[in-house]
Swiss-Prot record:
A GO molecular-function descriptor: GTP binding
Region annotated G3, chain positions: 90-93
Higher taxonomy: Archaea, Methanobacteriati, Methanobacteriota, Methanomada group, Methanococci
Region of interest (G2), ranges: 43-47
Binding site for Mg(2+) 1: T22, S45
Function (record text): eIF-2 functions in the early steps of protein synthesis by forming a ternary complex with GTP and initiator tRNA.
Name recorded for this polypeptide: Translation initiation factor 2 subunit gamma
Organism of provenance: Methanococcus maripaludis (strain DSM 14266 / JCM 13030 / NBRC 101832 / S2 / LL)
Gene for this chain: eif2g
Length: 410
């Protein structure tokens, strides 16, 4: 069970650019997840944003009015009982940032697919994001029909029918569709009830060896800090199994690239956990759920500017091997989604360059051999992954990487 300061479940906020993912996240959590200056300037999410909220229930009101994220009941002002804390992962909706969305999907226990009622459905990245959730095995999905305040009742019903038609035969075929206005905060109680009903906290085995997907890494020191005040590098990510404690030794793989003569190999990094935290709250032990900040003894130079994002961290000696080459069983989609002309997807070819997402890592690989049921791929950047893990596969089509399917590591 996650500590009380910690979220129990990670929910992805996905969908086409400008359909209101970040606005909805803000309404639910009070946090505007576009915090990087470039994001504020361009009005789009570039990196994964994270924000937590507590779902609460009024002890006297009926459903769904009893659900809120506020400090008191929205209907009667009465006392609230906290049901659980959840963490939202706000993924970029822009087509050029698909790799970031795919790396975020590996952290998601469920997802909210945001679709604007004011535009035709499906838009290109609505399709691509739904396929990505399917490819990476995210099955617990709620559809939010946002911006209903901008359309007439007839247009909202027509858009609802388009959503039903679009999701037919997909992983979201039976997903609830909740009409919402994130701008006005309308129907959020119904959405909170749906989150409680349709995205349960997964069963977690806390006795297994811990694994942490690293999604971000930072140097938290300000320029000009005194040497005595310097802090070690910080990594941020989600624990996917087991538990980490302050004082534990931590191994981070693939680690550092070392060149000796004309040979290059990767050396895992070993460090110690100095602190664990969620936002500004400190933890002694961290469990799966939410984004965890892990303070280490590492040289901050190793962690600055997300240098370790895409790594896997755990107790030394328990992590899978680092792969510079991988064999996968490909499962390709029939057509390319996300582009205007939905081309038929050809089988993988020998010497083809592919983009692969494994866990939170993004790498490029060249197929050494390719058959319909098996492909061997040499990776430009190695990844630390287990047999049986899913790999999202993207192919360069025109000037963009497009998701074409997934593979299982053999």
């Amino acid at each position: 069970m996650a500590a009380s300061n910690q979220s129990e479940v990670n929910i992805g906020m996905v969908g086409h650019v400008d359909h209101g993912k970040t606005s909805l996240t803000r309404k639910l959590t009070g946090v505007w997840t576009d915090t990087h200056s470039e994001e504020l300037k361009r009005g789009i999410s570039i990196r994964l944003g994270y924000a937590d909220c507590e779902i609460k229930k009024c002890e006297t009101c009926d459903e769904p009015e009893c659900y809120t994220v506020g400090k008191k009941c929205d209907s009667c002002g009465g006392k609230l009982q906290t049901l659980r804390k959840i963490s939202f992962v706000d993924a970029p909706g822009h087509e050029t940032l698909m790799a970031t969305m795919l790396s975020g999907a590996s952290l998601m226990d469920g997802a909210i697919l945001v679709i604007a009622a004011s535009e035709e459905c499906p838009q290109p990245q609505t399709k691509e994001h739904l396929m990505a959730l399917d490819a990476l095995g995210v099955e617990k999905i709620i559809i939010v029909q946002n911006k209903i305040d901008l359309v007439s009742e007839e247009a909202a019903v027509e858009n609802y029918n388009q959503i039903k038609e679009f999701t037919k035969g997909t992983v979201a075929e039976n997903a609830p569709i909740i009409p919402v206005s994130a701008h006005h905060g309308a129907n959020l109680d119904v959405l909170l009830k749906a989150i409680q009903d349709f995205i349960p906290t997964p069963e977690r085995d806390e006795t297994v060896s811990p694994k942490l997907y690293v999604a971000r890494s930072f140097d938290v020191n300000k320029p000009g800090s005194e040497i005595k005040d310097l802090k070690g590098g910080v990594i941020g990510g989600s624990i996917i199994q087991g538990a980490l404690k302050v004082g534990d030794e931590l191994e981070i793989k693939p680690g550092i690239k070392v060149t000796e003569g004309n040979k290059t190999h990767w050396v895992p990094i070993i460090t110690k956990i100095i602190s664990l935290g969620v936002g500004s709250k400190k933890l002694k032990t961290a469990y799966p759920g939410g984004l965890i900040g892990v303070g280490t003894e590492l040289d901050p130079n190793l962690t600055k500017s997300d240098a370790l994002s895409g790594s896997l961290a755990g107790i030394p000696g328990t992590l899978p091997e680092t792969l510079e080459k991988m064999e996968i069983e490909p499962q390709l989609l029939e057509r390319v989604v996300g582009s205007q002309d939905e081309l038929v997807i050809e089988p993988l070819k020998t010497n083809e360059v592919l983009m692969l997402n494994v866990g939170t890592s993004t790498t490029v690989g060249v197929t050494v051999s390719a058959r319909p049921d098996r492909a061997e791929i040499k990776l430009k950047l190695p990844v630390c992954a287990d047999k049986g893990d899913r790999v999202a596969i993207s192919r360069k089509i025109g000037s963009r990487w497009r998701l074409i399917g997934y593979g299982i590591i053999l």
